C-alpha cells in the first residue's frame, strides 16, 4: 500500500507497522541468487516502484548451481535464470539489473566482491540498500544459505566503509564512480526484524514475479499458500490488522 500526495510538497509513503514511511528516491537490492529478491522483498519493491522510487537489482551469482537436474549444463542454466530474473523484475517495475557472475555455491566475502558491489553502489547511488542478512539463524537453517550470508556481509562492507571512502578502490574514481553514502540498509530474513512493510496490495505481483522463476517454482503448487502464510505471520507479529500481509526487514542506519 502506498500513498502518493497530490499537492505540492507532499511525499509518497510506504505503509508499515511504524506508520507511513517516506519512500526513498533510489533503492538498490543486492542478493546472492536470482529469485532471492522475489522471495524476500518483491512486494516491497512493487510498492516502492508504484510510489515513484527507482529500484535496481544486483545479483551476485547467476544461479548456475540452482538445479538438481544435471541434464542442463551450468551455462545454459545461468542464461535461463538471467531471463527469469529479468522477467520477474519487470513484474514489479524494475528494469536495471546487474549480474556480477560470482560462482553460485561459492560466494565469499572477498575484496573482489566488495569492489564489484562498491562500483554498483556508486553507479546507482541509492538512498537505501536492501540485502540478505549476514546472521546465521540456527533454528531456520534454510534461511542461512552460505551464499546469502556472504552476499549480505559483503554488501554491508561495501556500504560501509567502501562506497563512501575515496581511498577504497581508487581505480573506480578513474572510471568516474564517485564516493556515495547510503542512508540505510534493510536486511531481509533477519532474526530481529524491526520494520514490516504492508504488501497486501502488491501480493499478486510478488507471486507473479516468483512464478517467472519457472526453473525454481514450477513444481510448487502450494506457492501462493506458502508465501501468504509467511507474510501473514510477519503482519501478525507487527500487530497489523487481520488479513494484512507484510515483508519484514531489519533497518541498519548507515549515514
Residue ranges and their predicted role:
Residues 2-28, 108-255:
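Metal-dependent de-N-acetylase/amidase catalytic core
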Amino acid at each position: 500500500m502506498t500513498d502518493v500526495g497530490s499537492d505540492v510538497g507532499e511525499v509518497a509513503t510506504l505503509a508499515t507497522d511504524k506508520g507511513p514511511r517516506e519512500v526513498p528516491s533510489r533503492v538498490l537490492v543486492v542478493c546472492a541468487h536470482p529469485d532471492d529478491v522475489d522471495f524476500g522483498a518483491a512486494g516491497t519493491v512493487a510498492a516502492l516502484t508504484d510510489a515513484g522510487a527507482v529500484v535496481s537489482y544486483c545479483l551476485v551469482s547467476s544461479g548456475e548451481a540452482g538445479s538438481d537436474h544435471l541434464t542442463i549444463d551450468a551455462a545454459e542454466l545461468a542464461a535461463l535464470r538471467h531471463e527469469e530474473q529479468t522477467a520477474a523484475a519487470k513484474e514489479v517495475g524494475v528494469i536495471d539489473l546487474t549480474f556480477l557472475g560470482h560462482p553460485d555455491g561459492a560466494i565469499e566475502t572477498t575484496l573482489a566482491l566488495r569492489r564489484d558491489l562498491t562500483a554498483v553502489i556508486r553507479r546507482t547511488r541509492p538512498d537505501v540498500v536492501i540485502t540478505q542478512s549476514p546472521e546465521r539463524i540456527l533454528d531456520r537453517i534454510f534461511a542461512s544459505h552460505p551464499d546469502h550470508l556472504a552476499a549480505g556481509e559483503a554488501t554491508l562492507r561495501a556500504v560501509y566503509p567502501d562506497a563512501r571512502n575515496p581511498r577504497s578502490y581508487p581505480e573506480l574514481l578513474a572510471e568516474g564512480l564517485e564516493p556515495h553514502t547510503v542512508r540505510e540498509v534493510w536486511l531481509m530474513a533477519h532474526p530481529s526484524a524491526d520494520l514490516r512493510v504492508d504488501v497486501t496490495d502488491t501480493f499478486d505481483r510478488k507471486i507473479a514475479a516468483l512464478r517467472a522463476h519457472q526453473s525454481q517454482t514450477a513444481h510448487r503448487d502450494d506457492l501462493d499458500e506458502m508465501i501468504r502464510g509467511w507474510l501473514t505471520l510477519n503482519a501478525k507479529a507487527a500487530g497489523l490488522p487481520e488479513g494484512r500481509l507484510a515483508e519484514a526487514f531489519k533497518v541498519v542506519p548507515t549515514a
